[in-house]
């Protein structure tokens, strides 16, 4: 990959870029030389054009994390490994594995969306009556699963990007049934509208994927709707009135 022709728009965040670099090396996540991977990542970031600075904010957070890990690795005896470095490396590896799983879920959703697109639906007799301009970047309560996934993912990355270095992520064991109950409890506690941060309150991809699938299921059952009034605006998760929780 030529770093001078590199374009961040081809990637969905720093973890996506790191996975691409691992793939280019034809290496396994568990055996990749992290110092070498960090060097290549940092070379790319250092050659970003000025016009990409705003886009690259989350990439710079990851760059700071990699610099921290690489600096400690270089200072230590190759035969030794500091416990903190080991934890940092394990956390980064865990994030990469979780993100890889997330991409697989996204791929399956795209396949389902493709199958759904092949189903023919007769146009209304008077099309103009039903036409309205839409902004595909926003959520209007009727968005398809891919739009919802992409919008929630971007919101998730934005909320947690600045905490990548500071947060020590512990194992979180959660299942869909548990998350459904927790989300319904949030509505009981806070009323008919719950903000994004309260529902996506654990910064792990696994927690995000399970919560995302639960929200899809609740939206399908018409228990909730998701509204975003403007691009990059706060996502509002609203309970639909008159719907009783299933016990």
From Swiss-Prot:
Locations listed in the record: Cytoplasm
Its keywords, alphabetically, are: Cell cycle, Cell division, Chromosome partition, Cytoplasm
Q: Its GO biological process terms?
A: cell division; chromosome segregation; DNA replication
Q: Which Pfam families match?
A: SMC_ScpA
Q: Where is it chiefly localized?
A: cytoplasm
Reading the lineage from the top rank, the first entry is Bacteria
GO cellular component, alphabetical, reads:
cytoplasm
NCBIfam families, from UniProt? Answer: PRK00104.1-3
Q: Which PANTHER family match?
A: SEGREGATION AND CONDENSATION PROTEIN A
Q: Which family does the UniProt entry place this protein in?
A: Belongs to the ScpA family.
On assembly, the entry states: Component of a cohesin-like complex composed of ScpA, ScpB and the Smc homodimer, in which ScpA and ScpB bind to the head domain of Smc. The presence of the three proteins is required for the association of the complex with DNA.
User: What is the protein's known function?
Assistant: Participates in chromosomal partition during cell division. May act via the formation of a condensin-like complex containing Smc and ScpB that pull DNA away from mid-cell into both cell halves.
Q: Name the chain's protein.
A: Segregation and condensation protein A
Q: What species does this protein belong to?
A: Mycoplasma mobile (strain ATCC 43663 / 163K / NCTC 11711) (Mesomycoplasma mobile)
